[in-house]
């Protein structure tokens, strides 16, 4: 590997890190804005639950569709499109004046929420299996850090610059900037390029999506444990993300500073776990193929 290629692939990681960081900021800060938005539209907790459920349902439906598209078309162009959609839907979400419009436009933000599979597969073609855990750990840092930045924007910045709509304009605009950055500066890589098995091949075969192979995933018992573990892990976090801030403010009487200093240490500890876990996974994998398990 040339020094130039080595530097470039870390440039790609940097671009994708900021894509995830700013996207997670945009996605997760709505929980910190619950009281502001609920007061603006005069909605109940049940209606607030519908706001967040809409985006989750849309994202769930579109995960396999994004995956299918990533297997057939350029991942860089699709990721640029996802970033463009993120920026546009967030702007629409800020513009609408009625709760019905807000509900629909918020659900539309789920379109780009399910776009991450292509990012991870593209990174896998830049880095070999012995480095991926560390790189994925770095990228996953973006989620809790984005959560923290979203809290700061919602609790500290929004009241100072005109309310929640103003911060949506900021994060939506950043999505458009990232879309341009990915489109023009991130290069597609041949699929499987970083796999050791393909290292000495003069010409690589082009692989296409296969429904038959996709169905084989569900026959692997290990994958069912992964699905169940993911469900059990995500379930409580959705409650914390979308309802906990209003609970602290309304039920416990916390002010913005109190909420921030209560949640920030938890988020920072969570963030450290991503990088440490990824690095330990790489360390164990170098010694046995079952190291990450």
What function would you assign to each model-found segment?
Residues 28, 56-64, 114, 147-148, ...:
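Residue-level signature of mid-helix packing/kink "hotspots" within the transmembrane helices
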Residues 11-45, 66, 240-245:
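Extracytoplasmic
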Residues 61-99:
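Conserved MFS/SLC helix-loop-helix module at the cytosolic interface between two early adjacent transmembrane helices
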Residues 42, 74, 95-101, 128, ...:
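Helix-breaking motifs and short loop linkers at transmembrane-helix boundaries and internal kinks
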């Amino acid at each position: 590997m040339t020094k130039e290629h080595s530097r470039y692939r870390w440039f790609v990681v940097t671009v994708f890190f900021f894509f995830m960081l700013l996207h997670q900021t945009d996605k997760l800060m709505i929980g910190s804005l619950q009281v502001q938005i609920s007061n603006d539209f005069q909605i109940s907790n049940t209606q607030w639950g519908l706001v967040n459920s809409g985006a989750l349902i849309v994202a769930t439906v579109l995960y396999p569709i994004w995956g299918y598209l990533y297997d057939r078309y350029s991942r860089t162009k699709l990721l640029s499109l996802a970033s463009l959609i993120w920026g546009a839907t967030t702007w629409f979400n800020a513009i609408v004046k009625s709760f019905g419009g807000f509900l629909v436009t918020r659900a539309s933000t789920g379109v780009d929420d399910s776009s991450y599979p292509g990012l991870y597969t593209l990174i896998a073609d830049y880095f070999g299996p012995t480095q991926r855990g560390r790189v994925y750990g770095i990228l996953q840092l973006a989620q809790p850090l984005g959560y923290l930045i979203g809290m700061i924007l919602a609790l500290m910045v929004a009241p100072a610059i005109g309310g929640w709509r103003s911060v949506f304009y900021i994060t939506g605009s950043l999505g458009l900037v990232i879309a341009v950055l990915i489109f023009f500066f991130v290069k597609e890589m041949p699929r499987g390029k970083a796999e050791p098995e393909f290292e000495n091949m003069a010409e690589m075969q082009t692989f296409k999506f296969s429904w038959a192979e996709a169905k084989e995933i569900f026959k692997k018992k290990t994958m069912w444990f992964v699905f169940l573990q993911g469900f059990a892990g995500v379930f409580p976090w959705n409650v914390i993300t979308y309802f906990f801030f209003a609970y602290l403010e309304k039920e416990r009487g916390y002010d913005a500073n109190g909420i921030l200093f209560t949640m920030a240490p938890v988020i920072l500890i969570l963030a450290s776990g991503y990088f440490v876990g990824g690095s330990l996974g790489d360390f164990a994998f170098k010694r046995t193929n079952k190291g990450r398990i």
